[in-house]
Swiss-Prot record:
Organism: Paracidovorax citrulli (strain AAC00-1)
GO terms for MF: mechanosensitive monoatomic ion channel activity
Subcellular location field: Cell inner membrane
Keyword annotations: Cell inner membrane, Cell membrane, Ion channel, Ion transport, Membrane, Transmembrane, Transmembrane helix, Transport
Subunit structure: Homopentamer.
PANTHER family, per database record: LARGE-CONDUCTANCE MECHANOSENSITIVE CHANNEL, MECHANOSENSITIVE CHANNEL MSCL
Name recorded for this polypeptide: Large-conductance mechanosensitive channel
Encoding gene, per UniProt annotation: mscL
Length: 143
């Protein structure tokens, strides 16, 4: 079997297609969660804690060249070591929201699986005719 044929069989299997769809939807869902965190949740958290923009929370760890603006992007471009804990907070909140949503989805799927009626037990198939005849012969020889 040629490599091209093997690859085609592998690529069109249901599991590979399902995985590809899952990755694409997951990427799009990640963008939705990013927007939710950055555009909705973090401004509210910032308002409660007195800061409106968590992305600019940072601690300068080195000397700042003269004339460099005191923004995170400018300091990073200037090569100044900074501890960007605001970005970390945003990413951590992002992760917690995404993990909670996935947890709720898995919980719902498991509940639906438990609610599905169990499949009726399969009835055993009738034995082939030659087996039936052999059993009859065996039983008649025992008598």
């Amino acid at each position: 079997m040629g490599i091209a044929k093997e690859f085609r069989e592998f690529a069109v299997k249901g599991n590979v297609i399902d995985l590809a769809v899952g990755v694409i939807i997951g990427g799009a869902f990640g963008k939705i969660v990013d927007s939710l965190v950055n555009d909705v949740i973090m401004p509210i958290v910032g308002l409660v804690f007195g800061r409106l923009d968590f992305s600019n929370l940072f601690l300068v760890l080195g000397s700042v060249p003269p004339g460099t603006p005191a923004t995170l992007d400018a300091l990073r471009k200037a090569g100044v070591p900074v501890l960007a804990h605001g970005s970390f907070i945003t990413v951590a909140v992002n992760f917690l929201i995404l993990a909670f949503i996935i947890f709720m989805m898995v919980k719902q799927i498991n509940r639906l699986k438990r609610a599905a009626p169990p499949a009726p037990p399969a009835t055993p198939a009738a034995p082939p005719e030659d087996i039936v005849l052999l059993r009859e012969i065996r039983d008649s020889l025992r008598r």
